[in-house]
Protein backbone atom coordinates (compact mmCIF):
# COMPACT_ATOMS: atom_id res chain seq x y z
CA UNK A 1 0.00 0.00 0.00
CA UNK A 2 2.76 2.46 0.87
CA UNK A 3 4.47 1.96 -2.48
CA UNK A 4 1.23 2.65 -4.34
CA UNK A 5 0.62 5.73 -2.19
CA UNK A 6 4.15 6.99 -2.88
CA UNK A 7 3.70 6.47 -6.62
CA UNK A 8 0.37 8.30 -6.54
CA UNK A 9 1.79 11.23 -4.58
CA UNK A 10 4.75 11.47 -6.97
CA UNK A 11 2.33 11.55 -9.91
CA UNK A 12 0.07 14.15 -8.31
CA UNK A 13 3.16 16.18 -7.44
CA UNK A 14 4.23 16.10 -11.10
CA UNK A 15 0.83 17.39 -12.20
CA UNK A 16 0.11 19.92 -9.47
CA UNK A 17 3.48 20.73 -7.87
CA UNK A 18 3.62 24.16 -9.49
CA UNK A 19 0.47 25.11 -7.57
CA UNK A 20 2.11 24.55 -4.18
CA UNK A 21 3.94 27.07 -2.04
CA UNK A 22 7.73 26.95 -2.05
CA UNK A 23 7.81 25.25 1.36
CA UNK A 24 5.18 22.68 0.42
CA UNK A 25 6.99 21.99 -2.83
CA UNK A 26 10.33 21.60 -1.09
CA UNK A 27 9.06 19.33 1.69
CA UNK A 28 7.25 17.03 -0.73
CA UNK A 29 10.17 16.98 -3.14
CA UNK A 30 12.53 15.93 -0.37
CA UNK A 31 10.12 13.44 1.21
CA UNK A 32 8.84 11.67 -1.89
CA UNK A 33 11.40 12.55 -4.54
CA UNK A 34 14.63 12.29 -2.58
CA UNK A 35 13.36 9.84 0.08
CA UNK A 36 14.37 12.05 3.02
CA UNK A 37 13.02 11.10 6.43
CA UNK A 38 10.89 13.51 8.43
CA UNK A 39 13.83 13.99 10.77
CA UNK A 40 16.20 14.85 7.93
CA UNK A 41 13.80 17.44 6.55
CA UNK A 42 13.22 18.87 10.02
CA UNK A 43 16.96 19.19 10.56
CA UNK A 44 17.45 20.83 7.16
CA UNK A 45 14.77 23.45 7.84
CA UNK A 46 15.37 23.73 11.59
CA UNK A 47 11.78 22.88 12.50
CA UNK A 48 10.23 20.07 14.49
CA UNK A 49 9.60 16.67 13.00
CA UNK A 50 5.91 17.17 13.81
CA UNK A 51 5.83 20.41 11.80
CA UNK A 52 7.23 18.60 8.78
CA UNK A 53 4.76 15.74 9.21
CA UNK A 54 1.81 18.13 9.47
CA UNK A 55 2.95 20.11 6.43
CA UNK A 56 3.38 16.97 4.32
CA UNK A 57 -0.02 15.54 5.31
CA UNK A 58 -1.73 18.87 4.67
CA UNK A 59 -0.01 19.14 1.28
CA UNK A 60 -1.06 15.59 0.37
CA UNK A 61 -4.67 16.60 1.05
CA UNK A 62 -4.22 19.70 -1.09
CA UNK A 63 -2.90 17.58 -3.99
CA UNK A 64 -5.80 15.14 -3.63
CA UNK A 65 -8.17 18.12 -3.62
CA UNK A 66 -6.70 19.43 -6.85
CA UNK A 67 -7.09 15.99 -8.42
CA UNK A 68 -10.69 15.69 -7.20
CA UNK A 69 -11.51 18.98 -8.93
CA UNK A 70 -9.34 18.87 -12.04
CA UNK A 71 -8.90 15.13 -12.75
CA UNK A 72 -5.66 15.69 -14.69
CA UNK A 73 -3.97 12.53 -13.41
CA UNK A 74 -7.10 10.41 -13.88
CA UNK A 75 -7.52 11.68 -17.44
CA UNK A 76 -3.84 11.04 -18.15
CA UNK A 77 -4.16 7.43 -16.98
CA UNK A 78 -7.31 6.93 -19.07
CA UNK A 79 -5.62 8.37 -22.16
CA UNK A 80 -2.65 6.05 -21.69
CA UNK A 81 -4.91 3.02 -21.24
CA UNK A 82 -6.88 3.92 -24.38
CA UNK A 83 -3.69 4.50 -26.36
CA UNK A 84 -2.32 1.13 -25.25
CA UNK A 85 -5.55 -0.63 -26.21
CA UNK A 86 -5.55 1.10 -29.59
CA UNK A 87 -1.94 0.14 -30.19
CA UNK A 88 -2.62 -3.53 -29.39
CA UNK A 89 -5.68 -3.57 -31.63
CA UNK A 90 -3.84 -2.01 -34.57
CA UNK A 91 -0.90 -4.38 -34.18
CA UNK A 92 -3.25 -7.37 -34.10
CA UNK A 93 -5.64 -6.33 -36.87
CA UNK A 94 -3.43 -4.25 -39.17
CA UNK A 95 0.16 -5.43 -38.67
CA UNK A 96 1.30 -4.45 -42.19
CA UNK A 97 -0.30 -1.01 -42.47
CA UNK A 98 2.69 1.34 -42.26
CA UNK A 99 0.64 4.53 -42.58
CA UNK A 100 -1.59 3.51 -39.67
CA UNK A 101 1.50 2.58 -37.63
CA UNK A 102 2.98 6.03 -38.28
CA UNK A 103 -0.26 7.79 -37.34
CA UNK A 104 -0.40 5.77 -34.14
CA UNK A 105 3.22 6.62 -33.32
CA UNK A 106 2.45 10.32 -33.86
CA UNK A 107 -0.57 10.05 -31.58
CA UNK A 108 1.42 8.29 -28.88
CA UNK A 109 4.11 10.98 -29.07
CA UNK A 110 1.45 13.63 -28.50
CA UNK A 111 0.08 11.87 -25.43
CA UNK A 112 3.56 11.64 -23.91
CA UNK A 113 4.15 15.39 -24.11
Curated annotation (Swiss-Prot):
Domain of life: Bacteria
Signal peptide: none
Disulfide bonds: none
Pfam families xrefs: UPF0122
Protein role: Might take part in the signal recognition particle (SRP) pathway. This is inferred from the conservation of its genetic proximity to ftsY/ffh. May be a regulatory protein.
Sequence similarity: Belongs to the UPF0122 family.
Protein name in the entry: UPF0122 protein LCA_0713
Natural source organism: Latilactobacillus sakei subsp. sakei (strain 23K)
